[in-house]
């Protein structure tokens, strides 16, 4: 908890810096994944939910909070921010876990106590109704200077072997 708390304080400081130095009172989107999702929930509650920032937050895409699931209950402590249930809704949370249907939820030796909220990004509903692939308008594929072909050329990952590191603090 201390480590996650320390990491959250860093996220909060970075968000404050962004708002004060770069945002210029413009709308913004919160986007997180995995551990970042766990930090985004308290950020929404502490910094955005009851402040003027809420009106500027277009949406919060909190993706992949598998170990500590994002649920309606985890959002219920907020006064003005809730789960998206309509494609035209603003100032809401969209969440889904990034795992295949039928995959085990027993991750890292931790069994999740409740099911996650799931906002289907094709229907914008939080029910379990399947939406067929025909409803997907497609994807935007990078072209030109935006197509870096990451991992396919000189930047392809290779195995690395590291020597043991000394203790960070010497007594």
Q: What is each PLM-predicted segment?
A:
Residues 1-3, 24-29:
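Short acidic, glycine/Ser/Thr-rich loop/turn "cap" segments at secondary-structure junctions
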Residues 10-25, 45-171:
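Surface cap/lid and interfacial helix-loop subdomains adjacent to catalytic sites
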Residues 3-11:
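Phosphate/oxyanion-binding active-site loops and adjacent basic polyanion-contact surfaces
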């Amino acid at each position: 908890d201390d480590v996650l708390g320390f990491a959250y304080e860093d996220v909060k400081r970075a968000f404050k810096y962004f708002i004060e130095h770069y945002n210029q009172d413009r709308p913004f989107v919160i986007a997180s994944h995995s551990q970042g999702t766990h930090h985004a929930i308290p950020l929404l509650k502490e910094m955005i939910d009851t402040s003027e920032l809420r009106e500027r937050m277009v949406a919060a895409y909190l993706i992949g909070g598998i170990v500590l699931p994002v649920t309606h209950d985890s959002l219920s402590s907020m006064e003005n921010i809730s789960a998206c249930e309509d494609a035209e809704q603003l100032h809401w949370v969209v969440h889904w876990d990034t795992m295949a249907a039928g995959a085990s939820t027993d991750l890292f030796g931790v069994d999740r106590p409740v099911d996650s909220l799931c906002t289907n990004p094709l229907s914008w509903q939080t029910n379990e109704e399947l939406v067929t692939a025909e409803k997907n308008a497609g994807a935007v594929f990078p072209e030109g200077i935006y197509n870096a072909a990451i991992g396919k050329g000189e930047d392809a990952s290779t195995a690395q072997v590291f020597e043991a590191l000394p203790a960070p603090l010497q007594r």
